[in-house]
C-alpha cells in the first residue's frame, strides 16, 4: 500500500507542477514586420542591406539575418570568433579566406567559415547576391571588423573549385 501511495503522490506532484510551470514558447519574427536597413558603411564597400536580423537572448549565442549585396558590394575583411555560416539564397557572389583564392558562390551554396578565420564575402562585380548569415557571439563579441578589401584582391580571377 505504501509504494502505491508514494507513486500516487509523485504523479499528483508531477501533474500539479505541469499546471504551474511556465509554458515554453517560440518567437516568430514576421517578414512583414521586419525592417530593411542599410549595413554599416564602415564595414562594407558598396551598397548592401540587412533584413530579418535576429539575436537570441542569453544563454543562447546565435545571431543572424539576411544580407543583400548589390553588384560590386562586399564586406571588409573580418573574423568571427566562433565562426560563421552563409547560406546563399539568390544570385552569385565571391568569398575568400586570407591567403586563399577568390571563390564563386551561388544560390543554394553553403559556406562554413571556421572560428578565427579572416575572410570576406560579397556580390560579384556584375551580379547581386543575397545570403543568410548565421553566427555565434563569444563573450559579447560577434565580429572583429578589419581593413577594406582592395579592388586588386576583389577582382582576382575566380578559382573554379569546391568551397572546401
Task: Please report, for each region that a protein language model flagged, where it lies by residue.
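A short, N-terminal "cap"/entry segment at the start of jelly-roll beta-barrel domains
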Residues: 22-61, 142-164
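Short beta-strand His + acidic residue motifs that chelate non-heme Fe in jelly-roll/DSBH
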Residues: 75-77, 95-96, 119-124
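Short acidic-glycine-tyrosine-enriched beta hairpin
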Residues: 99-116
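Bacterial N-terminal signal peptides that target proteins for export
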Residues: 1-10
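A short hydrophobic beta-strand segment most commonly corresponding to one strand
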Residues: 126-145
Amino acid at each position: 500500500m505504501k509504494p502505491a501511495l508514494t507513486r500516487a503522490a509523485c504523479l499528483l506532484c508531477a501533474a500539479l507542477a505541469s499546471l504551474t510551470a511556465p509554458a515554453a514558447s517560440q518567437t516568430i519574427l514576421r517578414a512583414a514586420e521586419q525592417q530593411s536597413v542599410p549595413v554599416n558603411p564602415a564595414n562594407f564597400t558598396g551598397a548592401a542591406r540587412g533584413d530579418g536580423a535576429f539575436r537570441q537572448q542569453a544563454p543562447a549565442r546565435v545571431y543572424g539575418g539576411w544580407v543583400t549585396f548589390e553588384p560590386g558590394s562586399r564586406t571588409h575583411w573580418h573574423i568571427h570568433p566562433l565562426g560563421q555560416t552563409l547560406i546563399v539564397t539568390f544570385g552569385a557572389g565571391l568569398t575568400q579566406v586570407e591567403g586563399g583564392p577568390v571563390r564563386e558562390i551561388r544560390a543554394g551554396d553553403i559556406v562554413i567559415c571556421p572560428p578565427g578565420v579572416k575572410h570576406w564575402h560579397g556580390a560579384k562585380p556584375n551580379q547581386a547576391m543575397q545570403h543568410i548569415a548565421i553566427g555565434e557571439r563569444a563573450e559579447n563579441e560577434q565580429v572583429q571588423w578589419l581593413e577594406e578589401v582592395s579592388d586588386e584582391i576583389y577582382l582576382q580571377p575566380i578559382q573554379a573549385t569546391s568551397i572546401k
